[in-house]
Amino acid sequence: MKIVDFVGPELIVPQLSAHEKSAVIRELADHLAAHVKGPQKIDREVLAKVLLERERLASTAIGEGVAIPHGKLDAVGKLVACVGRAPQGVDFDSMDGRPTHLFFVLVAPENSTGVHLKALARISRLFKDPDFRTRLMQAGDAADMYKVISDEDAKY
């Protein structure tokens, strides 16, 4: 599974303006809803609610400065994602107690459990690489961040 199949440079936010958990999720939901065209119009409020409800079950911050908020919403039509970066770090209730800097929002239609889980596993493996995380943090803009992702994808 290639990450570039469901995230493009237009779906990368290199400088999140939000400074707290729910605001980060809302900012990324807004960005995703504005840039993804599904079979139906993606309602940013509904998308944010789906992501926040999943977050209430357990934090999606996996440690090492990374969070993977995810959920299911039929309006997307297919697997979609949005990447965000918060250089200042955000308290995201991470397992390691450290601030979260990199966010990978993943949204899939309701009936796509297999694809959703494969994507989560692929993203988790990718973000376990400290060099990859460092390169994403040091990338200048959305295009540079996308290049880091696509270069890593080429190895897969």
Spell out what each predicted region is.
Residues M1-Y156:
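Cytosolic covalent-transfer regions centered on His/Cys nucleophiles
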